Amino acid sequence: MELPLGSDLARLVRVWRALVDHRLKPLELTQTHWVTLHNIYHLPPGQSQIQLAKAIGIEQPSLVRTLDQLEEKGLITRHVCAHDRRAKRIMLTESAEPIIQAVNGVISHTRNEVLFGITPEQVDELALLVARLEKNILALHENQA
C-alpha cells in the first residue's frame, strides 16, 4: 500500500499554520498576514498587487482581502500606479517595521521548536525533496496545458 504523501503534506501544512496562527494571535495577525508582510518586506518597494500575488503564489483576488486587513491595521498603504491607473502599488508603513520584527521573532522561535531534534542537514534534504516534488508537479501541469 502506498503512503498517502499528499495527505501527509497537507496535514503538516494545516497543523503548522494552526500553530503559527495561535502564536500570532496576541499580535492580532495570522499566518496569511505574516506571509504577505514578509513578501512585501523582502520584495523591492512599491510592488503591485499582481506582482505580490505572483511572489506569494496565489491569485490576486485572494490577496485583496488580506491587503484590506493589513491596510485597516495601518501596516500597509496602497497607491494608484502612475503608469497604470488600474494597478495599485503596495508600501509598508513606518508602524509595520516593529510589527514585522515581532512577527519574525515569533516565527523564528516557532520554527526552532518545530525543528527540535532535526539536524540542519535533514532540514536541507527535506527542502531539496520538497523543491523536487514541486518541480515535478509543475512540469506535470505544464504537460497537461
Curated annotation (Swiss-Prot):
Keyword Repressor listed: yes
Q: Which residues bind DNA?
A: 49-72
| Keywords carried by this UniProt record | Activator, DNA-binding, Repressor, Transcription, Transcription regulation
InterPro entries found in the cross-reference section:
HTH_MarR-typ, MarR/SlyA-like, Tscrpt_reg_MarR-type_CS, Tscrpt_reg_SlyA, WH-like_DNA-bd_sf, WH_DNA-bd_sf
The cross-references to SUPFAM superfamilies, in alphabetical order and at most eight, read: Winged helix' DNA-binding domain
Q: Which NCBIfam families does UniProt cross-reference here?
A: PRK03573.1 (NF002926)
Q: Which source organism does the UniProt entry give?
A: Pectobacterium carotovorum subsp. carotovorum (strain PC1)
Q: Gene symbol? A: slyA
Gene Ontology biological-process entries:
response to stress
Q: Per the database record, which ranges form the HTH marR-type domain?
A: 2-135
Full protein name: Transcriptional regulator SlyA
Q: What is the lineage of its organism?
A: Bacteria, Pseudomonadati, Pseudomonadota, Gammaproteobacteria, Enterobacterales
State any single GO MF term: DNA binding
**Record-stated family:** Belongs to the SlyA family.
According to its UniProt entry, what is the function of this protein?
Answer: Transcription regulator that can specifically activate or repress expression of target genes.
Assembly mode: Homodimer.
